[in-house]
Regions:
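Solvent-exposed alpha-helices and their adjacent loops that cap or buttress functional pockets
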Residues: 90-93, 122, 146, 166-169, ...
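Short, acidic/small-residue loops that bind anionic groups at enzyme active sites
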Residues: 152-162, 197, 211-238, 254
Length: 289
């Protein structure tokens, strides 16, 4: 299974990544302009040199500004993390992927663990690779279900709690991130669907941010499935809260709930994703050219 061609040109902003940036930042040190242009043209053997030119000029502008050394560190480290992630994902961009979220604290003997493993196994059989946070709990269950060859792990380096699970620990598809925002960007940019299991603040953060990005047109629309285990009501209770406190209060539209599919059946979850891609091809915003 592969991306439709139009999906290969997307990024997390919803814009065409092949379209050169309209941003033009003239450096305050004009003598460098020609050098930057020549360097960009010489180095850009596979891309429009204007991309590199703007990147270098941004750095020069920062070097001549009141930016702190820490500001530079963030820029450099975030850029390097994006580059490393791109190197890992690039060979697999023709394959659809499902991001799977859920608590790192779910134990092996809990129903949600087996449900996550079963769903990932189903996803693999339907041609999808899986992307997880690379840690324990639901993440490990999903990586076990898909297997190392069909799994990505986007691990976050923390002072406590999270370490890479045994499935992806030695995989060339394990990516370690220092910054949450870069990690989250890659989850959204590289996924064709999202499946969330019961979880805490981190899982809620991923669900709400993905909903926000799709609702506001900052990410390409794709299926969001909230998957419970048989007999459990975690997501039904969550959805009831959303209806009462957000929809009934007029804080969101009833139509926004159409972005979400709640189920307790792994087979139904993957069928929902398959059905979406049998029907969906593309969409446009009014006034977009």
């Amino acid at each position: 299974m592969k991306h439709p061609d139009f999906l290969d040109n997307r990024d997390f902003t919803g814009e065409d990544k092949k379209r050169p940036s309209t941003l033009h930042m003239d450096t305050s040190y004009k003598a460098l302009e020609g050098d930057v242009k020549r360097l960009s043209e010489a180095a850009s053997t596979r891309h429009d040199p204007r991309y590199l030119q703007e990147y270098i000029k941004t750095g020069i502008n920062m070097a001549q500004s009141d930016a702190s050394d820490h500001d530079f560190t963030v820029l450099i480290r975030a850029g390097r993390e994006m580059y490393r992630a791109n190197c890992v994902f690039a060979p697999y961009r023709h394959i659809r992927k499902v991001s799977i979220f859920g608590s790192a604290r779910i134990r092996h003997d809990e129903p949600a663990y087996e449900t996550a493993r079963e769903f990932a196994r189903e996803a693999n059989e339907h041609g999808y690779m899986v992307i997880t946070g690379g840690g324990p709990g639901i993440m490990q269950a999903a990586n076990e279900g898909a297997g190392e060859e069909r799994s990505f792990g986007l691990n976050i380096t923390l002072p406590y709690e999270q370490t890479s699970n045994h499935v992806v620990a030695n995989s060339n598809k394990l990516i370690n991130f220092y910054y949450f925002f870069v990690r989250k960007l890659n989850f959204v940019a590289e996924s064709d669907a999202m499946v969330a299991f019961p979880g805490g603040f981190g899982t809620m953060d991923e669900v709400f941010e993905t909903l926000t990005l799709i609702q506001t047109g900052k990410a390409t629309i794709y299926p969001i499935v909230l998957l419970d285990s048989p007999g459990k009501t975690f997501w039904l209770n969550w959805l009831a809260f959303i209806r009462v406190e957000l929809v009934d209060s007029g804080l969101i539209s009833e139509d926004d709930l159409h972005l979400i599919h709640v189920t307790k059946n792994p087979a139904e979850a993957i069928d929902h994703i398959d059905r979406f891609y049998r029907i969906f091809h593309s969409y446009r915003f009014i006034g977009d050219t």
